[in-house]
């Protein structure tokens, strides 16, 4: 698997590649026409034309005679992957894992099965402990930009917390990616103990809903209710 450091580096390189390719397209695209307002980069630069989104194959085939760019793309994107099942989604979120050095072991949420069943599962979190969340996912077909994971936490029907984790940008890979959140401290005290409902979303800059699911969380004095 790919660890967090590799993912962060890959995300930064992917963004650089996208910017370089967008600049190249911008310089070579001479067609006229009026763009929708949301596609304008800056009203102060009326000549700007937002480049169209390119597929991974188009990026790999772009400027084959530019040796430096070809080497850069090969180092960044790796070899061309074998064809994948077209029915597979571009992004697959496979697991969410709660990690704490104070826990008996990792708490793993399998996201490949029936998501509705997670509503009936309750994951226990001991109050006051330090913990991290690891998100495991795959990218199958195209580069995806600005992945993020959101958690909305509810108690008695009212939202009491919203967490947003910026996961980054990734290219297709035969291996799973892992993203680990910064360390957080679980709430503590009699007022926060009890049951919560969490609605989680995995989305991107294009607002594509790659996955959404609901699960139960219970904060108590120990790792067992």
From Swiss-Prot:
Subcellular location field: Cytoplasm
GO cellular component: cytosol; membrane
Cross-referenced InterPro entries: Ig_E-set (IPR014756), Rho_GDI (IPR000406), RhoGDI_dom_sf (IPR024792)
Keywords recorded for this protein, A-Z: Cytoplasm, GTPase activation
One GO MF term attached to the UniProt entry: Rho GDP-dissociation inhibitor activity
Gene3D superfamilies hit by this protein: Coagulation Factor XIII, subunit A, domain 1 (2.70.50.30)
Principal subcellular localisation of the protein: cytoplasm
Xref: Pfam families: Rho_GDI
GO biological process: Rho protein signal transduction
Family assignment from sequence similarity: Belongs to the Rho GDI family.
Function: Inhibits GDP/GTP exchange reaction of RhoB. Interacts specifically with the GDP- and GTP-bound forms of post-translationally processed Rhob and Rhog proteins, both of which show a growth-regulated expression in mammalian cells. Stimulates the release of the GDP-bound but not the GTP-bound RhoB protein. Also inhibits the GDP/GTP exchange of RhoB but shows less ability to inhibit the dissociation of prebound GTP.
Name of the molecule in the record: Rho GDP-dissociation inhibitor 3
Species name: Bos taurus (Bovine)
Gene field: ARHGDIG
